[in-house]
Amino acid sequence: MVFCGGALLILVPAMVTAMIYTALLQQGGEQLLFDALRIRGEMSSALLARRLYGVWMDVARSAELIDLTDLKNAREHIDFLSRLDRRYTWLGVADLEGTILAAKDGMLEGVSVAQRPWFRRGLVSPAAIDVHAAQLLATQLPAPREPYRFIDLAAPLRHAGSVAGVIGAHLDWKWVAESMDSLQVPGIDVLLLSGDRTVLFGPPDLINKPLNIGSALAASRVTTASLRERWPDGRDYFTVIVPTVGFANLPSFGWSLLVRQSADEALASTRNLIRSFWSSFGACAIATLALLFCAAQWLRAPLRRLSNTAEALLHDPSAHPPYSETRFNEAARLSDALARIQSKLMGLSVSNSIQGSGGDN
């Protein structure tokens, strides 16, 4: 009973405390992971946006410098900027009717772009057009191994305070993909999503596919969130949403970033720590029980001898005298008390015997 009671008193609170501790450890580990992924996502978004912003500033400055009434100067400016920055696959200007007046290497000059999104939106305000397949340029450029894909930047051209045309720039999507690739680290995926939740950059099995999971839905609603969820590959991931990719006055492409890490990989160190804790806890529990058992046996031996002696005295006061217990003070006092009780019982027995003998005489 002493052993069982002591074991319950020690192990039950210890188990409850250990379970609370491991739960807090797990929760703290997950929060640290989310924080790390959020920082990674924000840094990736900022780096990508700043790279795009550098190109945008060139386009915006060109919109201020180019005067469509001086096409020679416009061509010189376009040629200079195109040679200076090879990221431009195409750079050109169009009048209000959408006719290209001047362009890099003369590509598309005289062609109408009136129906192209970059032109229509560029007439109204600075614009950024999401990735799309090459259309008019497809026949002007060397045949590639893979179809050309571009993102567009556009801005209004003004003359005497009024819109006189549009400047447009086509950037090869490969440059954006290379920029995204440079943001990747082992074990962590940084995905780029379009406004309609299509994966523009990410794991090969997801590229150009719509992503219909909670984090993608949250990203499309411009909501910052961190969650653990199951992805189409059937695995659980810790996911952080960075809802916008923007910097300063860079026009929005409608992009968002998702940063994910496999839950199994992310929690491996935390689980190892928890496993080590429970192993240590188990070893300590076994050692504690062993010590408790030894202590119980240490207490039990004198108490058993004393109880046996007390039972013997009930039947025969002249039985073997109590063992002189010295293991602990209480046992010693009980032993002395039993010895005195035995002496009194034996004295009473002798007195009764004498009185019985006197009565017979």
List the predicted regions and their residue ranges.
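Extracytoplasmic/periplasmic ligand-binding sensor regions of membrane-associated signaling proteins
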Residues: I100-L171
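Solvent-exposed, extracytoplasmic
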Residues: K72-R87, R116-P117, S162, V166-S220
